[in-house]
Amino acid sequence: GSARFRWLVMGDQLAEARATVTALLREVRRRGQVESEVHFLRGLAETELRSGHCGRALDLAREGLRLAHDSGIGETASAMLTSLAEASGGDVDRGLALAREAVEHAEQDGDTMYLSRALGALGYAQLVAGDPAGTVRSLRRVRELEQSLGITDPARGRWQGDLAEALVRVGEPAEAQDVIDVTREHALRLGRESVLAALDRAEALVRAAHGEHDAAVAQLTSAQDRFAKLGYGLEEARAAFALAALRDRRSPAVFDEATRLFRRCRALPWLRQVDEAVSVPEPPVEAPAEPAVLDGLAAMERQVAALVMEGATNREIAARLFISVKTVEATLTRVYRKLGIRSRVDIVRLAAGRRAK
């Protein structure tokens, strides 16, 4: 029964997985088998989380964690699952704390398998908390650990899309594309549809970072539709959120669908991200800068410089390009060096001078 449940979850058969694990949980409770009850509570919570039922998943995960603490059985695994549930539907700080606790225990035990899973939970919580650099650090370690363990099935941890997204946000789209390409090969071979949709969502962000707006919108729209058909409610909402961020923010309704979907999931930490995005105003659209000003800059540097010329703040640039404010600052430093200037004011003056000529 347990093996069949895992096979169903990895194969995106969420309704069947829920029915299977619910029956298993009912049976072990009837028999008073506490160790199995802790295990199957985690399984049911995981299924609900993947289905986008974040409130239900959080209740089950917390129940399982209490039982694990009381019995001394499966505490690390329960902490990892509860971390994912907290970061999705509860308190993201609690999610971070639980994941770090699980990482510490796995390191103390020398358990490489559990360490990779705990770091995966930590990386996800860091992404939700707005720390993409932390996500990159955690999930690069997961990649190294899984390679050392010979794990090639991306449905085991499902961290690859999050790593790619975080890499885009810290200004590393080339590495993000490499993660996507390598993972897609395995996902296609194994038929992991939800993983492929997550990779498409991340690849759309790579395209957006390269200025391929229309292609990014088309890929995100497709990814959202695939998640909806598979029944992955939270992932569908995340795709809608990414899509909204690419659209014209002067329309007050641009984030409405993402808000509706996250509310349906009871994904409170994600709703807070939407609220923050809504509060970032769209910079005014002005005439495009003279291309010659930006010759010699890399793609990301050109985009950042062009937005500076439009009058965008670093925070606004970060929101529009799906990168962190620190990445914007580092990119601007490179722009200053290449253009032989000292400040963002000089970029605007340089552009104005070229236009005057």
Model-identified regions with their sequence ranges:
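Helix-coil-helix junctions within alpha-helical repeat/solenoid scaffolds
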Residues: 4, 11-290, 294, 312-313, ...
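Helix-turn-helix DNA-binding segment
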Residues: 279, 285-357
